[in-house]
A protein has these predicted regions:
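Structural marker of alpha-solenoid helical repeat scaffolds
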Residues: 80, 113-115, 148-150, 184, ...
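Canonical positions in the second alpha-helix
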Residues: 77, 110-111, 145-147, 180-181, ...
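Position-specific recognition of the canonical hydrophobic site in helix A of tetratricopeptide repeat
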Residues: 62, 96, 130, 166, ...
């Protein structure tokens, strides 16, 4: 219509002109500053550069990995502005980054003359000492300067100091440093959060109780202080007092997740499983589900013999952490208590599949198989158990019992001998041997072994019943037991 076709193709220069960055004031400013800087460097006529300009240039050169110009800018800046604490600090930071620690400390000495209470200089000196593994000097400079400052800066210094003590594994000093903060700033969240952990590490429960009681007197609505008080009571196994402290914490902040968690544990320690479930369910209602919480609720139902409910929570826990073999073992245990051997076997098998080196799982699986009359398969499980943990007597006892059950008496005696080689002398093995010998018809030997075991430790007679619950009623053994009681 107009006789030509418009060309909308732009050149690269034109595209750049439409780029927002092209019109960015900062970009233009730094470009001009760099030009002036290079003119100055060449000795040419140049515009005046201010303190802020030099700080901007140093940052620019550092960001662009221009070590030569960053170093030159630092030198010129501190020559032109020798009393600028900002530029002296920036130069020291640059020198530290270049690992020129001695030069950096010299610059900080100059800064100390200009601005003796510059907190950033104190932190930087400490950092330099730490880089050189001069830990005592890092601690000393922070300790010497902490009381020079008001609460906020003082707190920053003491928090830094506590971290250094942590690195040095001087854990008692970590606790005392955090305590110093709370004596003048009882609501400091960082210190309150950290001191709870360090009170436990240093077994400072009683001191922590006194400290937090004082804090609560000053700030009664301090939820974190009530929580820490509860943790301290719990550390001393004063569970009722811990529960009361958590109640106050939750009255102030009903979204305090760890208070629910710890209170639930305190109720569990007191075997108040209903209350524990109630509290842990509250935790689930306000927080993202966690396998440890679901596992704990399952445990509480388990203890109340509500096995179906226990399994429900164990399974929910396993969905969040499918590689936790112990959860599947616990599921198997609930089925075992209900004598549901096949289901128990499946749960134990999953646990063993995840953790093939757990002797307890092999034993549990073997016990299920024995109950299901799968004797040979059970024997394999027991043999695996003793191979995994030959130092535990219970694995050998399970194997011996299985051999006894299927009337492999000689093999059972042989395994008892091997068990003693690995575990040493055990009274339980003597009781086991007595039962086996009696079943072989070796009455005199059996009686001698039983009498020996009773003399050695009569309280372990359950080992005899473990092998064969009815054997204590055998006339021969019954007579020995009656005679032994009369002697007593």
């Amino acid at each position: 219509m107009f006789g030509y076709s418009p060309n909308f193709t732009l050149t690269k220069i034109e595209i750049d002109m439409f780029n927002d960055d092209f019109f960015d004031d900062d970009f233009r400013d730094i470009e001009n500053l760099v030009i002036e800087f290079h003119r100055m460097k060449k000795g040419e006529s140049h515009g005046l550069l201010s303190e802020d300009d030099f700080e901007y240039l140093i940052d620019y050169f550092e960001a662009n990995y221009d070590k030569e110009n960053a170093t030159y800018a630092c030198e010129v800046a501190t020559t032109l502005f020798p009393f600028s604490s900002t530029l002296l600090l920036r130069k020291a930071e640059w020198l530290m980054d270049q690992k020129k620690y001695g030069q950096a400390l010299n610059v900080l000495d100059q800064l100390d003359e200009v601005d003796p209470n510059n907190i950033e200089s104190i932190f930087l000196q400490s950092d330099i000492f730490l880089e050189q593994n001069r830990f005592s000097e890092a601690v000393d400079i922070l300790e010497r300067n902490a009381d020079k400052f008001d609460s906020v800066d003082k707190t920053d210094i003491l928090l830094e100091l506590s971290e250094i003590y942590d690195e040095l594994e001087e854990f008692d000093k970590v606790y005392t440093t955090l305590k110093r903060i709370l004596t003048y700033e009882p609501t400091n969240e960082d210190a309150l959060l950290r001191i709870c952990f360090w009170a436990e590490i240093n077994n400072k429960h009683e001191d922590s109780i006194s400290l937090h009681q004082e804090i609560i007197e000053q700030t009664p609505f301090n939820a974190m202080a009530w929580y820490n008080l509860g943790v301290a009571y719990q550390g001393l196994k004063l569970y009722e007092k811990a529960i009361d402290a958590y109640d106050y914490c939750l009255a102030i902040d009903d979204k305090f997740e760890y208070a629910y968690r710890n209170q639930g544990d305190a109720y569990m320690q007191l075997k108040k499983y209903d209350k524990a479930i109630e509290v842990l369910e509250m935790h689930l209602s306000i927080a993202k589900p966690e396998d440890v919480i679901l596992d704990a609720i399952g445990y509480c139902w388990d203890k109340q013999k509500q096995y179906s409910k226990a399994r429900h929570y164990y399974r929910r826990a396993s969905q969040l952490n499918p590689q936790d073999d112990q959860i599947f073992y616990k599921i198997g245990e609930t089925y075992t208590k209900e004598l549901q051997w096949e289901k128990a076997m499946k749960a134990y098998s999953i646990a063993l599949h995840i953790n093939k080196n757990n002797a307890s799982y092999c034993l549990a699986l073997g016990n299920c198989l024995m109950e299901m009359h799968a004797d040979k398969e059970a024997m394999i499980c027991y043999l695996n158990a003793v191979q995994l943990r030959p130092d535990i007597k219970s694995t050998w006892q399970a194997l011996v019992k299985a051999l006894y059950t299927i009337s492999y008496f000689e093999e059972a005696l042989s395994q008892l001998g091997i068990a003693e080689e690995h575990c040493g002398h055990k009274t339980e093995f003597i009781y086991n041997k007595a039962a086996i010998l009696l079943s072989q018809g070796k009455t005199k030997e059996a009686v001698l072994q039983l009498e020996h075991a009773l003399t050695e430790n009569n309280k372990k007679i359950s080992a005899l019943k473990y092998i064969d619950n009815e054997i204590v009623h055998h006339p021969v053994f019954a007579e020995v037991l009656v005679r032994y009681k009369k002697k007593k």
